């Protein structure tokens, strides 16, 4: 879940077409690059040569440098800063250049946000990204800012598109090799804050990439030379946050290694200097730019640093004069957990990678702060996504309060926030114990999404909530919620991707929802027509698991058009193709046991008349994998083989009976759920209830078993 890439400043993410501000400019008060080249006083990648820099240094004395710096720090308006740039940029050294850019970025953007209602509207609506099956990039509904982008407008037009800013950028380029780590971090932060580089997808031109690589390389050299314990945490934080804002991956592993090695030293030896916001923004930046490392000590040390802070700096409430900078707030916690979780998962670390003590301390703090009050919607959605992403166990008290909070805030959740919570409901059913009221509240909020009757975020969001409900086996108590969600499916069916249509059909089957023939036809026609258009017999390249889910979904919702109609005949052909795909996979021994069971059961529910060869291949594979089948899947297979009138050999039948006695007709196999054949959960714990035992007993007798004692 991605909070705004400009989370450090509370601004909404967004990147813009390159205004080419980092390219060589025309001549200004001081000599241009071309003039310096002609004079032999320019080195590529380094700017002016030593002799030329020495000349400039003599003209801009140390006294002038100090004077300029004083003027910049005492300037309180954008106009004052630009006046200094206009009059004295030729005298700027590395400190002056980075300071001027930083002052313009911090002061100028604040002025624009305060004075431009359009920008304020776009920056006040922070959101989380869409998550789950397809992507982790932001796909929230189009904002006012994005609409302005399509018209080639820029929120900071008057700041960055003028001659004075170009002159300043030239000065930054000329001095970048002389900047220390803090100056470089300020330059990176300022360019990100002003949204100068690239577009919202992170696409940069070659000149921009070279500049970012140069800044990163110089920053790495500076922090290594300075030593991590002596580098201000803010420099590390601003630098990594900026690259996350750029969505720019640093490809030179040696550069990242130098930075991360010094970060580890800083967290270990200078932990008390780190503010929570600095830790959180750094992790957000690392994750957002995909700059995560596979070095475990990096994550271990940042967690240790955070734990130390949480123990040392309690939350201060009801004291406006207290210094809160070193106390974790709800916002810091949600950012920290999101960045940490996303980076850990990208490097395939397991659920135990996030320290249980850290989780406990942070979630206690979240509850104590009421999830951040007005910002609870954003904080909750980010936090539960992070917890679900790494399957983190959570304290019961946290879930108790969370289950109370979600119904209260559900009506003000944005589409992307609902998306994040819905995904966590489906993804983490073992670790996040949502109660029925919380689940129903999220489903209702999606059903009644007030952003519009139908908008571009709805198709995937509606599919996701049906998936989440099916994972929990939950049908909302208020039946109108399902009716409204089904109506949304009907409205946006043409915009649903094929995978989402399959997901919805499968969920309807699991939940035993009867949505009506009209909307089912809209979804099913996609698969029937795709299969009809294909030249092979494999259902338009549907994967075996997709075939199994479709067969099972059709059977569960009892969808089988009359074979006397043209469409009915096409549908029958479609079913046979699905079964043939499963059989081909079974023949090649590539069929997953769970997929096999689901497909066979779907065929049985549909009472499908399979070709003898197809049935034999599926049955033989079920017998071959009998020992691998989980009890619930085994029960499905036995039921299906009996329903489809398979004739097993005596040896095969004995094998089925033995497996049934060990798993179905025993109380010693496991102890957990009271599952039966209709349960879609194929988990490891299974205790057959009396209904399942009777169904399996009858099925085995149909297959020819004499005694089941």
Regions found by a protein language model. Give the residues of each.
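Eukaryotic RNA-binding helical-repeat scaffolds
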Residues: 3-709
């Amino acid at each position: 879940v991605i909070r705004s890439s400009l989370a450090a400043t509370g601004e909404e993410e967004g990147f813009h077409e390159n205004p080419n501000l980092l390219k060589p400019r025309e001549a200004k008060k001081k000599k241009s690059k071309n003039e310096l080249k002609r004079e032999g006083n320019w080195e590529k990648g380094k700017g002016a040569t030593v002799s030329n820099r020495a000349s400039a240094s003599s003209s801009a004395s140390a006294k002038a440098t100090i004077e300029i710096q004083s003027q910049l720090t005492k300037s309180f308006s954008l106009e004052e800063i630009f006046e200094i740039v206009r009059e004295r940029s030729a005298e700027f050294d590395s400190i002056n250049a980075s300071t001027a850019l930083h002052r313009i970025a911090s002061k100028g953007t604040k002025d624009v946000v305060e004075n431009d209602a359009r920008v304020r509207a776009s920056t006040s609506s922070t959101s989380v990204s869409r998550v789950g099956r397809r992507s982790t990039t932001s796909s929230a509904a189009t904002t006012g800012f994005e609409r302005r982008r399509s018209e080639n407008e820029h929120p900071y037009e008057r700041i960055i598109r003028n001659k004075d800013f170009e002159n300043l950028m030239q000065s930054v380029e000329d001095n970048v090799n002389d900047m220390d780590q803090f100056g470089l971090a300020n330059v990176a932060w300022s360019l990100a804050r002003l949204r100068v580089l690239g577009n919202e997808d992170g696409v940069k031109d070659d000149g921009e990439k070279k500049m970012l690589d140069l800044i990163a390389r110089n920053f790495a050299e500076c922090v290594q030379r300075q030593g991590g314990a002596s580098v201000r945490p803010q420099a590390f934080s601003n630098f990594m946050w900026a690259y996350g804002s750029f969505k720019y991956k640093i490809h030179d592993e040696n550069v990242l290694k130098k930075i991360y090695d010094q970060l580890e030293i800083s967290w270990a030896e200078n932990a008390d200097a780190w503010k929570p916001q600095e830790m959180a923004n750094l992790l957000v930046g690392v994750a957002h730019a995909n700059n995560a490392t596979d070095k475990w000590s990096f994550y271990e040390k940042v967690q240790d640093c955070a734990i130390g802070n949480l123990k040392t700096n309690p939350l201060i409430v009801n004291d406006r004069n207290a210094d809160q900078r070193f106390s974790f707030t709800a916002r810091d916690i949600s950012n920290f957990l999101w960045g940490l979780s996303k980076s850990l998962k990208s490097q395939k670390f397991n659920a135990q990678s996030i320290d249980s003590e850290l989780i406990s301390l942070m979630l206690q703090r979240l509850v104590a702060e009421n999830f951040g009050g007005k910002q609870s919607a954003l904080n909750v959605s980010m936090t539960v996504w992070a917890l679900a992403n790494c399957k983190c166990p959570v304290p019961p008290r946290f879930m108790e309060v969370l289950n109370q909070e979600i119904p209260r805030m559900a009506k003000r959740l944005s589409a992307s926030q609902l998306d994040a919570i819905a995904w966590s409901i489906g993804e983490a059913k073992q670790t996040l114990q949502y109660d029925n009221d919380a689940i129903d509240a999220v489903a209702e909020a999606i059903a009644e999404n007030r952003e519009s009757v139908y908008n571009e975020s709805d198709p995937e969001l509606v599919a996701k909530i049906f998936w989440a409900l099916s994972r929990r086996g939950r049908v909302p108590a208020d039946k109108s919620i399902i009716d409204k969600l089904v109506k949304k499916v009907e409205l946006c069916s043409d915009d649903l991707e094929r995978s989402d249509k399959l997901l919805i059909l499968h969920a309807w089957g699991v939940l035993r929802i009867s949505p009506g023939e009209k909307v089912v036809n809209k979804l099913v026609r996609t698969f029937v027509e795709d299969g009809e258009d294909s030249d092979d017999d494999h259902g338009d390249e549907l994967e075996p698991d997709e075939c199994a889910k479709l067969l099972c979904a059709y059977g569960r919702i009892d969808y089988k058009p009359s074979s006397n109609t043209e469409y009915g005949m096409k549908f029958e052909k479609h079913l046979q193709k699905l079964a043939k795909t499963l059989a081909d996979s079974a023949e090649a021994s590539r069929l997953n046991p769970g997929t096999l069971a689901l497909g066979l059961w779907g065929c049985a529910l549909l009472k499908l008349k399979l070709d003898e060869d197809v049935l034999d291949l599926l049955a033989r594979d079920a017998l071959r994998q009998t020992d691998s089948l989980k009890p619930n899947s085994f029960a499905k297979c036995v039921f299906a083989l009996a329903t489809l009138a398979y004739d097993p050999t005596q040896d095969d039948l004995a094998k089925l009976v033995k497996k049934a006695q060990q798993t179905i007709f025993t109380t010693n196999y496991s102890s957990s759920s009271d599952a039966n054949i209709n349960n879609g959960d194929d988990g490891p714990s299974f205790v057959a209830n009396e209904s399942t035992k009777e169904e399996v007993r009858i099925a085995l007798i149909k297959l020819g078993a004499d005694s089941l004692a």
